[in-house]
């Protein structure tokens, strides 16, 4: 490709509404342009990157037997009503009515459509297992689109769906998909982690997320320094190895005027923060003998003062209402509770986190305004309904697998795989004839990759003050840089420079390398700045002075090192 025939849409200034580095650099490098809130045009430079990511994803899906399909973005609302998600999904699901007064949705995901396809096309267990995938646009009506294409309303996604006669078959494909995702991110040269995850609105049982590690990531992930254990902080089990010591203090109420937080309390009493507890009161219900939900009641959740409540874990307590809802001020007053000073000796179920349950001589609220109680001890002064894991893990916690300690880092979710089970196949009556001649409800797996999101995540992980640095890949042909090599001929009165640049350009193309000849009528400084901004990994400068010595100036974008190389050395360098 010749630069004079290609759209270089670089910007000198950063758009004011670009809120993170990847968005700023993608706009400045001319990869994308904003059309409206959460909607972006992919320019030629950016589309080349997008298509390269799609190619790697497509190859790995096909390598494990995935069959590519293409489903419409517009979906009949009746399918979503049949699955039960039409109302559950919320306002992110864009609903509309066509001219014939029929209801439709703009697809944020395709579980319903693929299940409808499967129930119409799959007849026998002999056709299974089978995996279908597509790479296609999705639409989610985000309330606050932000971070460029990271959280856009319209985005490109690879979604795959597998169908099975039993759980054992699903687990085999799930592992194959896990391995394929691992290969995809390895081929892309990204620093990533696969972590245990929550199934969310998709539903199902087992689930893993794939995160690109970056300081700007929205998610916190915990991983061990002594094993391959990794999990989303929301799901990581919090281990407590401490044993409760015998009491050494008597309980005593102390005045704590205007103290609002545990941090203020610890400072006021000159004690370690971890020797305090906080009590959070949520809505709940009694559990009847038959296991059904009974009358409404309030439930107390107690964690250490230096820990935070994990709402996902708390929702797993049978007596806690879902979604987790904190008691209102009126409800607490009716129960005789003093907001900000709630203790642990309460006339309601009291669920205590493991770490808080290991405390002795701790400080809690006194159930009186401007008062706390020191020297509190479990069993002697307050009763525990049950000891549970209801907190987020923190840096330095013991790893749940017993190997090493946990580190916490930020991550950008770029992939998510689920074992759906029969949630959708049962709702949509998707069955095949089993080996025994009887109908079998299919088991399903669901596997998504944010194709466009990968690009933003890669830039968040790899950039400098001059622009994008595309990650070095094990195979140069897997590089997702729009061009891998740029040849810059310097202006000269002689034809030799351009002729040499043209010859080198043709040779590199013949070797199957992705090269651009920057023949634009621009100053060298402008060309160099553009190429650094876009992140072209290899830059070759052809000039009179260096050709006199049969040399080429080579610059590696990743380290900025300049070298004078012979033709043979140059060809060896850019072919790595």
From Swiss-Prot:
One cellular component term (GO) for this entry is: cytosol
Q: What SUPFAM superfamilies has UniProt attached to this entry? A: Class II aaRS ABD-related, Class II aaRS and biotin synthetases, YbaK/ProRS associated domain
Give the primary localization class.
cytoplasm
List the EC numbers from the record: 6.1.1.15
Which Pfam families has this protein been placed in? HGTP_anticodon, tRNA-synt_2b, tRNA_edit
InterPro entries, from UniProt?
Answer: aa-tRNA-synt_IIb, aa-tRNA-synth_II, aa-tRNA-synth_II/BPL/LPL, Anticodon-bd, Anticodon-bd_dom_sf, Pro-tRNA-ligase_IIa, Pro-tRNA-synth_IIa_bac-type, Pro-tRNA-Synthase_IIa_type1
* Lipoprotein is among the record's keywords: no
Localization recorded for this chain is: Cytoplasm
Output the Gene Ontology terms for molecular function.
Answer: aminoacyl-tRNA deacylase activity; ATP binding; proline-tRNA ligase activity
GO BP terms in the entry: prolyl-tRNA aminoacylation
Keyword flag Ligase: yes
Recorded superkingdom: Bacteria
Which family, according to the similarity comment?
Belongs to the class-II aminoacyl-tRNA synthetase family. ProS type 1 subfamily.
* Domain notes from UniProt: Consists of three domains: the N-terminal catalytic domain, the editing domain and the C-terminal anticodon-binding domain.
The record's function comment reads: Catalyzes the attachment of proline to tRNA(Pro) in a two-step reaction: proline is first activated by ATP to form Pro-AMP and then transferred to the acceptor end of tRNA(Pro). As ProRS can inadvertently accommodate and process non-cognate amino acids such as alanine and cysteine, to avoid such errors it has two additional distinct editing activities against alanine. One activity is designated as 'pretransfer' editing and involves the tRNA(Pro)-independent hydrolysis of activated Ala-AMP.
What protein am I looking at?
Answer: Proline--tRNA ligase
The organism encoding this protein is: Psychrobacter sp. (strain PRwf-1)
């Amino acid at each position: 490709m010749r630069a004079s025939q290609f759209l270089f849409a670089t910007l000198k200034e950063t758009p004011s509404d670009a809120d993170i580095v990847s968005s700023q650099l993608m706009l400045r490098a001319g990869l994308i342009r904003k059309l409206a809130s959460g909607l972006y045009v992919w320019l030629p430079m950016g589309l080349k990157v997008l298509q390269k990511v799609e190619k790697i994803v497509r190859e790995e899906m096909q390598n494990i037997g995935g069959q590519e399909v293409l489903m419409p973005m517009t979906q009949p609302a009746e399918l979503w009503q049949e699955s039960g998600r039409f109302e559950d999904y919320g306002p992110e699901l864009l609903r509309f009515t066509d001219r014939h007064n029929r209801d439709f949705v703009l697809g944020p995901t395709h579980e319903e459509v693929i299940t409808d396809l499967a129930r119409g096309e799959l007849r026998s267990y002999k056709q299974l297992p089978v995996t279908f995938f597509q790479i296609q646009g999705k639409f989610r009506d985000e309330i606050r689109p932000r971070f460029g294409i990271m959280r856009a309303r319209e985005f490109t996604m690879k979604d795959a769906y597998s169908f099975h006669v039993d759980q054992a078959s699903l687990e085999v494909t799930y592992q194959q998909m896990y391995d394929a995702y691992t290969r995809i991110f390895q081929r892309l040269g990204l620093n990533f982690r696969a972590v245990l995850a929550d199934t969310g609105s998709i539903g199902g049982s087992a689930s893993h997320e794939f995160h690109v590690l970056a300081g700007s990531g929205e998610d916190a992930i915990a991983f061990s320094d002594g094993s391959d254990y990794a999990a989303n902080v929301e799901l990581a089990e919090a281990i407590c190895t401490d044993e409760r010591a015998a009491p050494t203090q008597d309980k005593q109420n102390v005045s704590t005027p205007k103290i609002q937080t545990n941090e203020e309390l610890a400072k006021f009493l000159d004690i370690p923060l971890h020797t305090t507890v906080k009590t959070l009161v949520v809505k709940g219900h009694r559990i009847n003998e038959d296991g059904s939900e009974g009358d409404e009641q309030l439930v107390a959740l107690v964690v250490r003062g230096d820990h935070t409540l994990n709402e996902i874990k708390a929702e797993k307590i049978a007596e806690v209402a879902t979604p987790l809802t904190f008691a209102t001020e009126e409800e607490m007053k009716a129960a005789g509770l003093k907001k900000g000073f709630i203790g642990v000796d309460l006339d309601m179920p009291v669920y205590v986190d493991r770490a808080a349950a290991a405390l002795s001589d701790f400080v809690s609220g006194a159930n009186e305004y401007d008062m706390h109680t020191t020297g509190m001890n479990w069993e002697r002064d307050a009763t525990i309904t049950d000891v549970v894991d209801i907190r987020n893990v923190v840096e330095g916690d013991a790893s749940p697998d017993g190997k090493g300690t946990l580190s916490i880092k930020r991550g950008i979710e770029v992939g998510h795989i689920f074992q759906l089970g029969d949630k959708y196949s049962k709702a949509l009556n998707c069955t095949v004839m089993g080996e025994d001649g009887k109908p079998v409800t299919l088991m399903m797996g669901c596997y998504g990759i944010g194709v466009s999101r990968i690009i933003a995540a890669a830039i968040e992980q790899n950039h400098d003050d001059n622009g994008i640095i595309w990650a070095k890949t094990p195979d140069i042909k897997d590089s997702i840089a729009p061009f891998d090599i740029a040849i810059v001929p310097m202006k000269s009165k002689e034809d030799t420079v351009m002729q040499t640049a043209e010859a080198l350009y043709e040779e590199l193309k013949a070797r199957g390398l992705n090269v651009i000849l920057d023949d634009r009528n621009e100053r060298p400084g402008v060309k160099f700045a553009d190429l650094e901004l876009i992140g072209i990994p290899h830059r070759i400068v052809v000039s009179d002075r260096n050709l006199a010595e049969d040399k080429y100036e080579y610059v590696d974008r990743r380290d900025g090192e300049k070298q004078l190389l012979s033709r043979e050395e140059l060809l060896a360098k850019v072919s790595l």
